[in-house]
Curated annotation (Swiss-Prot):
The keyword Zinc does not apply. Keywords: Cuticle, Repeat. Component of the cuticle of migratory locust which contains more than 100 different structural proteins. Sequence repeats lie at residues 7-10, 48-51, 55-58, 60-63, 66-69. It comes from Locusta migratoria (Migratory locust). The lineage of its organism: Eukaryota, Metazoa, Ecdysozoa, Arthropoda, Hexapoda. Transmembrane segments: none annotated. GO terms for molecular function: structural constituent of cuticle. The sequence shown here is that of isoform LM-70A. The tetrapeptide (A-A-P-[AV]) repeats found throughout the protein are also present in many proteins constituting the protective envelope of other species. This is Cuticle protein 70, isoforms A and B.
Amino acid sequence: GYLGGYAAPAVAVAPAPALAVAHAPAVVVATSYARISQVTNSVPIAVAAPAVPKAAVPVAAPVVAAAPVIAAHAPLALGHGFGYGGYH
């Protein structure tokens, strides 16, 4: 899932507490999306994506929001054999 794809690599390669703190917001966001996905089954998420059906939000919104972060971490992730969101 998102938490496994985004948070696990950060935690696994973070040698210093400062890195863990820096990545904490991403963990919160991923966890929030997971909870929203469970709670709202067919209701559009107005704040995150007003014009996108709820079913597409858990996939589209986090990926779009995380794209710059994924790009920034790609060399590190690839170097360690991690796959973001299950994609290698």
